[in-house]
């Protein structure tokens, strides 16, 4: 057990040891959370989705869309999945304590929000909502380990998110 000669010594310990450890764990936790949401969003493409909170269920593809898919050599009824380009455009970036999960494709915006001709088929928003419990557990683990100064267990897995020692 650590003992401190003064409150100043304790403050130095917190400043030099605990705060950097918490920051390190937060960064790794944010990376794991972003990866979890990214992977969930990617997995939605090609499968009809039911409604999630305020996000609507995906409607059936229009007959002309199905015919166009078949004419171009794709399967008839795998919504938002043809070549995999949209799926592969979904990624994430983490900088400090900020994460961005999204797509580099303009098509993603049209599909997520819909247009006057295309009904919304959201996949990014629902990916966050559907992972709420896993994200809570992840953040609990990250904060607890950071405050206690413990490393992350290499086997910690939460539905695809993983914290690894040394990351």
Predicted feature residues:
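Short, Lys/Arg-rich flexible segments
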Residues: 1-167
């Amino acid at each position: 057990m650590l003992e401190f000669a003064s409150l100043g010594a304790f403050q130095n310990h917190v400043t030099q040891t605990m705060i950097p450890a918490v920051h390190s764990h937060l960064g790794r936790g944010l990376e794991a959370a972003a990866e979890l949401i990214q992977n969930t969003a990617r997995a939605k493409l090609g499968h009809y989705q039911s409604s999630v909170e305020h996000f609507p269920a995906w409607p059936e593809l229009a007959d002309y869309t199905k015919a166009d898919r078949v004419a171009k050599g794709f399967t008839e009824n795998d919504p938002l999945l043809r070549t995999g380009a949209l799926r592969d455009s979904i990624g994430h970036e983490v900088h400090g304590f900020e994460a961005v999960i999204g797509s580099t494709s303009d098509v993603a915006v049209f599909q997520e929000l819909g247009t006057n001709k295309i009904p919304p088929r959201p996949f990014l928003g629902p990916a966050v909502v559907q992972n709420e419990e896993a994200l809570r557990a992840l953040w609990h683990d990250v904060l607890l380990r950071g405050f206690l100064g413990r490393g992350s267990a290499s086997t910690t897995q939460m539905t695809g998110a993983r914290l690894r020692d040394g990351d």
